[in-house]
From Swiss-Prot:
Phylogenetic placement of the source organism: Bacteria, Pseudomonadati, Campylobacterota, Epsilonproteobacteria, Campylobacterales
Organism: Aliarcobacter butzleri (strain RM4018)
Reported function: Required for rescue of stalled ribosomes mediated by trans-translation. Binds to transfer-messenger RNA (tmRNA), required for stable association of tmRNA with ribosomes. tmRNA and SmpB together mimic tRNA shape, replacing the anticodon stem-loop with SmpB. tmRNA is encoded by the ssrA gene; the 2 termini fold to resemble tRNA(Ala) and it encodes a 'tag peptide', a short internal open reading frame. During trans-translation Ala-aminoacylated tmRNA acts like a tRNA, entering the A-site of stalled ribosomes, displacing the stalled mRNA.
One GO BP: trans-translation
Gene this chain is encoded by: smpB
InterPro entries xrefs: SmpB, SsrA-bd_prot, SsrA-bd_prot_CS
Keywords from the named record: Cytoplasm, RNA-binding
Main location: cytoplasm
Family, as annotated: Belongs to the SmpB family.
Transmembrane helix keyword on record: no
Record's protein name: SsrA-binding protein
Length: 158
């Protein structure tokens, strides 16, 4: 029974597209405002952060376009929108710091991962990021393949 709890704590949903499309500059951990059925859906793994992004609107931070699908057990009259905007919980100093960075050219806010922390609370990792150009993406792919090949060669000599 203890193993089940441990696996639920370690549920991590990553936004792999963000790591591919952006250069990550700085990360922050934030709380997220959810409804009860959304928490249950996250525990079941019904989350997709692929197209999600973060915006600062009137001094508050929101996660937009994150897909948390509803459960089949929820009543049809009470089904929140799957892609609704969800408020992120941050200190005002953190919001001001992020806002000052975002107003610079080319820097955006991206949701990197959604996970359960040690207290079994759902947290989201938000990053300030700068978009990559096509040649940057190609260089990263080349570096990955070179690293993979060298690891394979080293492994074959062991």
């Amino acid at each position: 029974m203890a193993n089940k709890k441990d696996t639920k704590k370690n549920l991590v949903f990553k936004n792999k597209k963000a790591f591919h499309d952006f250069t990550i500059l700085e990360t922050l951990e934030a709380g997220i405002v959810l409804e009860g059925s959304e928490v249950k859906a996250i525990r079941e793994g019904r989350v997709n952060l692929k197209d999600s992004f973060v915006r600062i609107i009137k001094g508050e931070v929101f996660l937009l376009n994150a897909h948390i699908s509803h459960l089949s057990t929820t009543h049809s009259t009470y089904r929140p929108d799957e892609r609704r905007s969800r408020k992120l919980l941050l200190h005002s100093k953190q919001i001001d710091k992020m806002y000052s960075k975002v107003t610079k050219d080319g820097i955006t806010l991206v949701a990197l991962k959604l996970y359960f922390n040690d207290k079994n609370m759902i947290k989201i990792e938000v990053a300030t990021a700068q978009g990559k150009k096509l040649h940057d993406k190609r260089e990263d792919l080349k570096a990955k393949t070179m690293k993979r090949e060298t690891e394979q060669v080293l492994k074959s000599f062991k």
